[in-house]
Amino acid sequence: MSEVTRVTVWNEFRHEKTDGEEPQKVYPKGMHNAIADYLKKQPGFEVRTATLDEPEHGLTQEVLDNTDVLTWWGHAAHQEVKDEIVERIYKRVLDGMGLIVMHSAHFSKIFKKLMGTSCNLKWREVGEKERLWVIDPSHPIAAGLPEYFEIPHTEMYGERFDIPAPDELVFVSWFEGGEVFRSGCCWHRGAGKVFYFRPGHETFPIYYQKEVLKVIENGVRWAKPSGGPAHYYGHVPEPLEKITSSK
């Protein structure tokens, strides 16, 4: 495990190029660069970006082998992500790479594969207020945050969110229209850690908000490989101790 946490910020990067003025105005360099620019300023991070339209979606085996934590944003082109790249990411997560899944990436191939469920939910896009409550203040992802924070205008996601029960639940969101949502969920998969974080939308400046960026930073620090012992599976012909009772 590297002393520096190597982060790859992945973005579909379609809305900012093709969806008219609003996404381009809000994120002229793409959402991935809004996130990466912040992470590059934080201590202990080495940051690169990758996007869908790059060869191999920017996620060659070499890139993934040199990634401690991968962040993922996608929405309109989930089906364009090649299955072999998804399998490549999946194996790296099981081997210990952290994965941060954001907003509409709940429908991404990699998240659905890791969850084993539909990952479906309710939604509404009218620009309403979201209030995120920290419900586990002892969790590392909540470090440095207030008891709650608000996003002035966002897309609503509502329960039921069809996911396995999280190993750890850090945030719950309330929306101005009345819905609630499990908006900060953690799982362990193999040797890797997965964090789903709800906020983030292509037409709202959410990835410039300090609390949101702090959560992403904390999520990366939590999800990075821990440096624990490697585990081995399969037949073990040589016992650790002498066996005297075998036939």
Predicted features by range, described:
Residues 2-21:
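Short beta-strand segments enriched in small/hydrophobic residues
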Residues 2-4, 125, 189-247:
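Extracellular ligand-binding/catalytic regions of CAZymes and related secreted enzymes
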Residues 12, 73-75, 200, 224:
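Cell-envelope and extracellular/periplasmic
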Residues 24-108:
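Helical hinge/lid and interdomain linker segments adjacent to catalytic or ligand-binding clefts
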Residues 46-48, 65, 121-198, 233-235, ...:
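Catalytic beta-strand/loop cores that center a nucleophilic Ser/Cys/Thr
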Residues 77-145:
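A glycine-rich, often tryptophan-bearing local segment used as a flexible ligand/cofactor-contacting loop or short
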